[in-house]
A protein has these predicted regions:
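Active-site metal-binding motif and surrounding structural segment of the metallo-beta-lactamase
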Residues: 71-122, 144-154
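Conserved beta-strand hairpin/beta-sheet module of binuclear metal-dependent hydrolase folds
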Residues: 27-80, 118, 178-180, 226-237, ...
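Residue-identity detector for glycine
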Residues: 9-10, 14, 29-32
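Active-site neighborhood of phospho(di)ester-bond hydrolases with catalytic His/Asp-centered motifs
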Residues: 67-70, 87-95, 123-124, 235-240, ...
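Metal-dependent phosphodiesterase/nuclease catalytic metal-binding core
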Residues: 27-29, 153-296, 305-316, 332-337
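Metal-dependent catalytic neighborhoods of phosphoester/phosphodiester hydrolases
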Residues: 102-110, 131-134, 304-312
Length: 337
């Protein structure tokens, strides 16, 4: 189930790397919660008076994650009435300025708000060095900034029930796409619990993901849970040529967000040269991945009206939308399952 709010105006293929430290207890407790998704900006290369640079904000269970932070990202957040201070993680797809140059200002704003909680940054190899360079103008902060560089041997990582999957894409610098996945445990099966002689007094606690012990016997959540149900998934990838990694990681997504740098068919040669995607190529990926909805983003500054290409693009994938700054969606678990 989802609810979409769309303001009319405003603002090398590689190995899959899975970042996952979600505990079974967290998975067992994820019920009835909402994932807020907001595409803060939709521009590529440079901010424009009517279009901020591409950035994605997601909020779930009281936590916030931001993907990319170009120039003006915190202004786009303010326009939505959101504060940068609650951000817990910032992920970077790559280190071109339109995706990371807004970080120093964001850090200073957080510091001025007297933030004390650590901030986690995730990005390609070299992140620590890049952040150190940017922090020359933000050296004194009242909170710790931690960096995790994605490598082929990345260690599992968890964040309040999110599972993050980073996958290599094909740009002219090292670049990754991201999927955010929220797993959902199965329903509590009373008959199964009774068959295994689980005391009824433990049922509610097992549903919350607790592991319990009584008289030397251990009771775990999976002993009373049915098959895992469909959770939620959002996939985001920009600044890349079409790759098999994007297709594979997009499967099962409730919302797919891909770059549509160019809408004109004759810009395909330019897209290939600069390692970007056309709207038509993005639509083809969405079709092959069988997702329910595609939002296009990261438009060329020369493209003032991306929506004018939708009639032709939808011939490939009907559920394609030329996203605008500030588009939001609320994703919920299907309570019918």
């Amino acid at each position: 189930m989802d609810r979409q709010i769309c303001p009319s105006g405003g603002r090398s293929t590689g190995d899959r790397i899975i970042i996952d430290r979600t505990t079974d207890a967290v998975k067992a407790g994820l019920r009835g919660r909402m994932l807020d998704v907001c595409l803060l900006g939709t521009g590529g290369m440079m901010p424009l008076p009517y279009r901020w640079l591409t950035s994605l904000m997601m909020r779930y269970n009281g936590k916030s994650i931001l993907i990319d932070c170009g120039e003006g990202t915190q202004i786009a957040m303010r326009e939505k009435g959101w504060s940068p201070n609650p951000i817990d993680i910032i992920c970077f797809t790559h280190f071109h300025a339109d995706h990371i140059s807004g970080l120093p200002g964001m850090l200073l704003t957080m510091g001025n708000a007297e933030r004390t909680e650590p901030l986690l940054l995730i990005g390609p190899r070299g992140l620590t060095k890049v952040v150190a360079s940017l922090r020359v103008i933000a050296p004194e902060l009242p909170f710790e900034v931690k960096c995790i560089e994605i490598t082929e041997n990345a260690q599992p990582f968890s964040f309040e029930g999110f599972r993050l999957e980073a996958f290599r894409v094909n740009h002219n610098v090292l670049c990754y796409g991201y999927s955010m996945v929220i797993d959902r445990a199965g329903r509590f099966d009373k008959d199964r619990a009774m068959e295994q002689e689980i005391p009824m007094k433990f049922w509610s606690r097992l549903q919350k993901g607790e592991t319990l012990e009584e008289n030397g016997r251990v009771f775990t959540p999976d002993m009373g849970l049915g098959a895992e149900r469909k959770g939620l998934k959002v996939t985001y990838s920009t600044d890349t040529r079409p790759t098999e990694s994007i297709r594979q990681n997009s499967k099962g997504s409730d919302l797919l967000i891909l770059e549509g740098m160019y809408g004109e068919p004759d810009k395909l040669v330019k897209a290939r040269e600069h390692k970007h995607m056309t709207m038509y190529e993005a639509a083809k990926i969405a079709k092959e991945a069988e997702v329910p909805k595609l939002w296009l983003t990261h438009y060329s500054p020369s493209m003032t009206r991306p929506e004018e290409f939708m009639e032709d693009v939808r011939k490939i994938f009907p559920a394609t939308y030329a996203a605008k700054d500030g588009w939001t969606m609320e994703l919920k678990f299907d309570e019918g399952e």
